[in-house]
């Protein structure tokens, strides 16, 4: 009995201790989790640099690391400031860090910096060097004056009858990036663009928008790796003037022009009554290349509205298109803004129904030009709607007297049918380019202008002061460039 009673007391005491350890004074349970294990230390096990096979001004640094999430390269040349690449993922334990924008013939050293939950760690130093430019690109010179906005200027150059180059040069005129594409037939320069997905697209082909010859756009990564080709679906030919990619994945869409050729009566514009000419179609393609939207100029436009004169010999049918679109962009509401050079017209088209929303300029102009001493534009290029809703375009000025090229910004009031000139820039001395050209409003508020037919680029402030200029020459002569377009970064899309 005594032993039994003693056991009961001991058990009660034990129960009291156990229960008391799991209760607080206010009756709420307190659970004390075990301390987390310390994060595992980030370790870089190897780094190695290699040349880029498509671009002597680029390199690649391979890194293998443990317990790291991401890595970047800090690098520089002797006596120069340290630069940094964007970070890349190390989720798989290894990655290749692209290094872009190197200077020809310069040696660099750098360290890989890896990041993880335990902090960051740096590798031993690794060396690499930029090579020489290809011989064809060594014929290119860019002379600059002034100080331009940060970033690079893109230009597409067909050189030596053998290679089409996508080139980026900095504000000092040094070529800092390129990608070459070999060809065996004559090439026309076309649209070169950095898309919002960070990749670049370049037109490869001989057409200028009317010839019965094949062509396509090639999409390639900043490293130069070719990703895919994009073309108008059969039976259309692919036009060289514009490609814009929007969205991603299943929502990705490609916006471009195609064209076909038909026998037409050109007598209303002084040509033969039966000649084969080209007419264009606005296309929106799905990721698989099928058409989601088509809008044919043959159905909506008239040959008799062709106001830019055809070539001296209208029977040279391989060179004729009556509409000649050269810009395709999206308005703030998602509808299309199209520039038709040969019609002297900018058109807004409903991107779903295909209905014409308005027509500015040309024979079917629906607007009154206000405060514009030249009462409109002609042979225009690069029409874009700005974030404030204004229309910015490059006015080639073929129909001005005297002929002069300028950049114009209009405030549009579709309800009142007015286009009010709110800003323009005319170069001093005057520059006239009958063909090609580009204009961009930069993040700084400055405007970048590409006088492509003259191989000249200008950046101007809002008050019209020239901040920077560049002259691009090949073998000492001005080079024809379809567009001279600014980008903010070689690695990823960034507003310039």
Roles of regions detected by a PLM:
Residues 55-61:
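Structural beta-strand segments of beta-rich domains
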Residues 12-16:
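Hydrophobic helical h-region of N-terminal Sec-dependent signal peptides
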Residues 40-43, 50-55, 107, 113-496:
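Histidine-/acidic-rich catalytic cores in large beta-rich domains
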Residues 17-49:
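Bacterial Sec-dependent N-terminal signal peptides
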Residues 72-105, 117:
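Recognizes extended acidic, P/S/T-rich segments that occur
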Residues 65-70:
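Short proline/glycine-enriched turn/loop motifs at strand-loop junctions of beta-rich domains
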């Amino acid at each position: 009995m005594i032993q039994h009673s003693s056991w009961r007391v001991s058990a009660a005491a034990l129960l009291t201790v156990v229960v008391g350890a799991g209760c607080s004074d206010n009756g709420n349970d307190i659970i004390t989790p075990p301390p987390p294990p310390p994060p595992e230390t980030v370790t870089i096990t190897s780094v190695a640099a290699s040349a880029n096979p498509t671009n002597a001004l680029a390199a690649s640094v391979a890194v293998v690391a443990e317990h790291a999430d991401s890595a970047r390269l800090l690098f520089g040349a002797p006596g120069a400031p340290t630069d940094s690449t964007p970070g890349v993922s190390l989720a798989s334990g290894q990655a290749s860090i692209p290094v872009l924008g190197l200077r020809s013939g310069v040696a660099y050293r750098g360290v890989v910096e890896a990041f993880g939950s335990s902090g960051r760690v740096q590798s031993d130093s690794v060396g690499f060097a930029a090579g020489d430019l290809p011989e064809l690109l060594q014929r290119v010179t860019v002379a600059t004056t002034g100080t331009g906005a940060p970033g690079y200027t893109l230009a597409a150059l067909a050189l030596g009858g053998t290679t089409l180059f996508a080139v980026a040069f900095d504000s000092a005129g040094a070529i800092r990036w390129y990608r070459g594409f070999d060809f065996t037939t004559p090439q026309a320069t076309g649209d070169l663009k950095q898309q919002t997905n960070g990749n670049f697209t370049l037109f490869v082909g001989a057409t200028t928008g009317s010839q019965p010859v094949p062509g396509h756009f090639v999409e390639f990564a900043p490293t130069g790796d070719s990703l895919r080709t994009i073309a108008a679906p059969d039976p259309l030919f692919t036009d060289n003037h514009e490609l814009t990619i929007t969205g991603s994945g299943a929502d990705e869409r490609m916006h471009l022009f195609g064209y076909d050729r038909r026998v037409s009566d050109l007598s209303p514009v002084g040509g033969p009554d039966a000649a084969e000419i080209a007419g264009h179609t606005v296309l929106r393609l799905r990721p698989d290349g099928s058409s989601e939207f088509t809008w044919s100029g043959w159905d909506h436009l008239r040959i008799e509205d062709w106001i830019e004169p055809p070539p001296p010999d209208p029977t040279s049918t391989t060179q004729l298109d009556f509409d000649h679109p050269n810009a395709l962009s999206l308005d703030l509401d998602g509808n299309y803004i199209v520039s038709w050079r040969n019609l002297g017209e900018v058109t807004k088209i409903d991107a779903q129904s295909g209905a014409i929303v308005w027509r500015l300029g040309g024979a079917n102009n629906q607007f009154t030009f206000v405060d514009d001493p030249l009462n409109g534009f002609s042979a225009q290029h690069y029409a874009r709607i700005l974030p404030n809703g204004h229309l910015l375009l490059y006015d080639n000025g073929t129909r001005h007297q005297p002929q002069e090229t300028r950049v114009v910004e209009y405030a549009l009031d579709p309800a009142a049918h007015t286009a009010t000139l709110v800003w323009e820039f005319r170069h001093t001395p005057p520059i006239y380019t009958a063909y090609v050209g580009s204009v961009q409003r930069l993040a700084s508020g400055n405007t970048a202008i590409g006088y492509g037919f003259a191989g000249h680029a200008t950046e101007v402030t809002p008050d019209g002061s020239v901040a920077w200029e560049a002259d691009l020459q090949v073998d000492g002569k001005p080079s024809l460039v379809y567009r001279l377009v600014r980008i903010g970064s070689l690695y990823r899309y960034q507003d310039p």
